[in-house]
């Protein structure tokens, strides 16, 4: 091998290159101008920068969560509106006044029935859970039409 500043190694007509390029001619195989090397490096780095990340595109059926132009695929928050103290007291009185004087003396039966009574309204149909319940929107102009 010769003692030249080139980065190529020639072994019996086989050329090993560190960088991809065109086939070298015998006269220019050992020396390449440094300006061409720099141009090759800059063009290869420019090509790598052109990659773009995929963008999310929402369909018309996607929920506009909280009417703040935030598109979501799920309803993730359970909202309980604040009530005044008077409303809370009235609800508590109503729930406790429903119990009649014909309560059984067995307290274990009452405790088991209490859980069922809270989850079912007076008509016997269970209440939907937070993910099954669809909130009532006052401004229906922002919602898609249901067909």
Swiss-Prot record:
Stretches with biased composition (Acidic residues): 103-118
User: Which UniProt keywords are present, listed alphabetically?
Assistant: Nucleus
| Principal subcellular localization | nucleus
Which residues lie in Polar residues bias regions? 1-14
Q: Where is the composition biased (Basic residues)?
A: 45-55
- Give its localization: Nucleus
Q: Which Pfam families match?
A: PPI_Ypi1
Compositional bias of kind Basic and acidic residues: 135-147
The residue ranges flagged as biased composition, category Low complexity, are: 22-43
Q: Which GO terms describe its molecular function?
A: protein phosphatase 1 binding; protein serine/threonine phosphatase inhibitor activity
Cellular compartments per GO CC:
nucleus
Residue numbers spanned by region Disordered = 1-74, 87-147
Task: Give a short account of what the protein does.
Answer: Regulator of type 1 phosphatases which maintains protein phosphatase activity under strict control.
| Stored PANTHER family | E3 UBIQUITIN-PROTEIN LIGASE PPP1R11, E3 UBIQUITIN-PROTEIN LIGASE PPP1R11-RELATED
List the protein's name.
Type 1 phosphatases regulator YPI2
